[in-house]
């Protein structure tokens, strides 16, 4: 398979540095996807709420996260133990970082989470190469993150790769331009990141604004609110709009993963 990477020169700031590193990591990797795999849709199904449930509750994607550029070291988590604790606390799915330099992730962490977890697992990384999606499927993940800020107009191509591999795709956006690109590509799961990954600043108003815009545009898929949620009050504005919330730092650094997961979703 002939593959040319996305144009990463247009990606600024912290995000630009990270994706440039990941492109270098995979520059000489095999771009073939292998045999087509049947879709399971377990990740999507675990998150999707009925219209009646959407205003009453949220599904939780709990993240196994050792560190981040904004926080530094967060917690020395045992990935398998963390996965079990999150599931005990009611998580519908688990996100696991595999980016090593800035987030302390690894392939081994993802494999351990998959082996320990009875809920579907998202590979959380900065996907810039087909090999990263092939790996996600081979390692047992049910879904992979696709960032419009990184892939831009190449998003449909990468969505087709996830379909070939039987993976669900969490398509992530942060602003209206990215949302328009995502909606044109027809995703089934759309994540709204409150964090501007070029500056690392958080604005909790981003998710409700873009979610309302997505629903008004006719999007009927799964909506996920991402980043900056530390307490139930933080989630007030996304009830009724979101199906799910993805939470990493506040859970991973809590010292009581199951208890923190339960407390976050308490109403």
Swiss-Prot record:
Statement: the UniProt record of this protein carries the keyword Lyase: yes
Catalytic activity annotation: 1-(2-carboxyphenylamino)-1-deoxy-D-ribulose 5-phosphate + H(+) = (1S,2R)-1-C-(indol-3-yl)glycerol 3-phosphate + CO2 + H2O
CDD domains registered for this protein in UniProt: IGPS
GO BP terms: L-tryptophan biosynthetic process
Pfam annotation, one family: IGPS
Record-listed E.C. numbers: 4.1.1.48
Single annotated GO MF: indole-3-glycerol-phosphate synthase activity
Matches recorded under InterPro entries: Aldolase_TIM, Indole-3-glycerol_P_synth, Indole-3-glycerol_P_synth_dom, Indole-3-GlycerolPSynthase_CS, RibuloseP-bd_barrel
Top-level lineage group: Bacteria
PANTHER family per UniProt: INDOLE-3-GLYCEROL-PHOSPHATE SYNTHASE, TRYPTOPHAN BIOSYNTHESIS PROTEIN
Similarity comment: family membership: Belongs to the TrpC family.
Stated name of the protein: Indole-3-glycerol phosphate synthase
Gene: trpC
């Amino acid at each position: 398979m002939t593959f040319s990477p996305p144009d990463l020169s247009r990606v600024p700031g912290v995000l630009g540095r990270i994706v440039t590193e990941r492109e270098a990591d995979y520059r000489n990797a095999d771009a073939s996807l292998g045999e087509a795999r049947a879709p399971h849709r377990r990740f999507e199904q675990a998150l999707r709420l009925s219209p009646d449930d959407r205003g009453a509750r949220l599904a939780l994607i709990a993240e196994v996260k050792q560190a981040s550029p904004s926080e530094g070291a967060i917690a020395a988590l045992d990935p398998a133990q963390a996965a079990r604790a999150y599931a005990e606390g009611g998580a519908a799915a688990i996100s696991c970082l595999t980016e090593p330099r800035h987030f302390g992730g690894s392939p081994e962490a993802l494999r351990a989470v998959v082996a320990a977890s009875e809920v579907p697992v998202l590979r959380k990384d900065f996907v810039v190469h087909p090999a990263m999606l092939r790996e996600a499927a081979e390692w047992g993940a049910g879904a992979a993150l696709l960032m419009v800020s990184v892939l831009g107009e190449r998003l449909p191509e990468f969505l087709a790769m996830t379909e070939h591999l039987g993976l669900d795709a969490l398509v992530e956006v942060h602003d209206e331009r990215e949302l328009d690109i995502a909606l044109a590509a027809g995703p089934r799961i759309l994540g709204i990141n409150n964090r501007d990954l070029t500056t690392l600043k958080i604005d909790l108003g981003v998710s409700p604004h873009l979610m309302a815009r997505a629903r008004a545009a006719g999007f009927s898929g799964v909506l996920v609110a991402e980043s900056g949620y530390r307490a139930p009050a933080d989630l007030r504005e996304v009830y009724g709009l979101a199906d799910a919330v993805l939470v990493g730092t506040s859970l991973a650094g809590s010292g009581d993963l199951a208890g923190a997961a339960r407390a976050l979703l308490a109403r």
